[in-house]
Each structure stands twice: as C-alpha cells, then as structure tokens.
C-alpha cells in the first residue's frame, strides 16, 4: 500500500491523558439523502503520538497506518495549529 493511498484527516485533539496516544475529533458535513439538509457528523479516532508533543485543543493532521494497538489505526503526521496556554 502506497502512502499516497492512505486516508488523511484533519481534527482537534480532545484528550491527551494517555501516553503516546491522543483522541482526535474529526468533524464533517454530509447531506441527508432524503431531506437534503446538511448534517454535521463527528467521529473520534485514537492516534499514535510518538513524542507526546500534542496537547488538548491542537489541530492536527492524522494518517491511516497499520494497527498499533487494539483501537489505534491512525498516527499524527503534522500539527497544524497549536493551542495558546
């Protein structure tokens, strides 16, 4: 599998309480098939953060990768925006 074929998402870190693991909330908008109203959807992904460098509130880019643990199939690739302390 090439790296270009891997899924990439952008989201906000909502939990940094685990060691080397971050919970990233990815929000998106879809159109309802029958009523055609735009609906906001959100999903949480557990992502691997090797250096523990992200904090809660950071906007990050995550990429699909091989399973790291039972729930982790994503890794943090880039920090787009840091939170102000």
Swiss-Prot record:
Keywords: Ribonucleoprotein, Ribosomal protein, RNA-binding, rRNA-binding. GO terms for cellular component: cytosolic small ribosomal subunit. SUPFAM superfamilies: Nucleic acid-binding proteins. GO terms for molecular function: rRNA binding; structural constituent of ribosome. GO terms for biological process: translation. Gene3D superfamilies: Nucleic acid-binding proteins (2.40.50.140). The keyword RNA-binding applies. Part of the 30S ribosomal subunit. Belongs to the universal ribosomal protein uS17 family. One of the primary rRNA binding proteins, it binds specifically to the 5'-end of 16S ribosomal RNA. PANTHER family: 40S RIBOSOMAL PROTEIN S11 FAMILY MEMBER, SMALL RIBOSOMAL SUBUNIT PROTEIN US17M. This is Small ribosomal subunit protein uS17. It comes from Natranaerobius thermophilus (strain ATCC BAA-1301 / DSM 18059 / JW/NM-WN-LF).
């Amino acid at each position: 599998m090439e790296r270009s074929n891997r899924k990439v998402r952008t989201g906000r870190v909502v939990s940094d309480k685990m060691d080397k693991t971050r919970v990233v909330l990815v929000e998106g908008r879809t159109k309802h098939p029958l009523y055609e109203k735009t609906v906001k959807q959100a999903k949480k992904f557990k992502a691997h953060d090797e250096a523990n460098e992200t904090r809660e509130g950071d906007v990050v880019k995550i990429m699909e990768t091989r399973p790291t643990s039972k729930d982790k199939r994503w890794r943090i690739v880039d920090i787009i925006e840091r939170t102000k302390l």
